[in-house]
Amino acid sequence: MNTPHKLLIIDDNKEILSALKDFFTRKSYEVFSAADGLEGLKILETERQSFDLVITDLVMPNISGVALISIIKKRFPDTPVIAITGWGEHPEALATEAQADKVLEKPFELSELDRLIKDLLPPV
């Protein structure tokens, strides 16, 4: 039996976090979630490089998504990161600066995010 892909989703918007967690759990992913960058970083450190992909908001309290992505890319360089954001005039520039693999602007369709994940991860 194949092991499901393991995702970490980080967003300070509770509704978005809940919707993403529910959607990807139904899609048979193993989903962990965090309400801010600091909590996300703690989960990453606890799980020790076992995430297949991280989805993070860019604008959050404690540790911004931009800073978090930079940390992830230094500590876990093989882990793809998708940045999601609804703020700023140039979200692509922020995500590129932080070295996100993909960026998605809010609002977005869940199917669009699912497609990006499938593009970044091998089939299970």
Where does each model-flagged region fall?
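Active-site residues of response regulator receiver
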Residues: 11, 57
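Two-component/phosphorelay signaling modules centered on CheY-like receiver
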Residues: 14-32
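Acidic, metal-coordinating helix/loop segments flanking the phosphotransfer/catalytic sites
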Residues: 33-53
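Acidic catalytic/metal-coordinating carboxylates
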Residues: 36-39, 64-68
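Receiver (REC) domain active-site loop signature in two-component systems and cognate sites
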Residues: 60
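Alpha4 helix (beta4-alpha4-beta5 surface) of REC/receiver domains from two-component response regulators
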Residues: 67, 87-104, 115
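C-terminal output helix
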Residues: 108-118
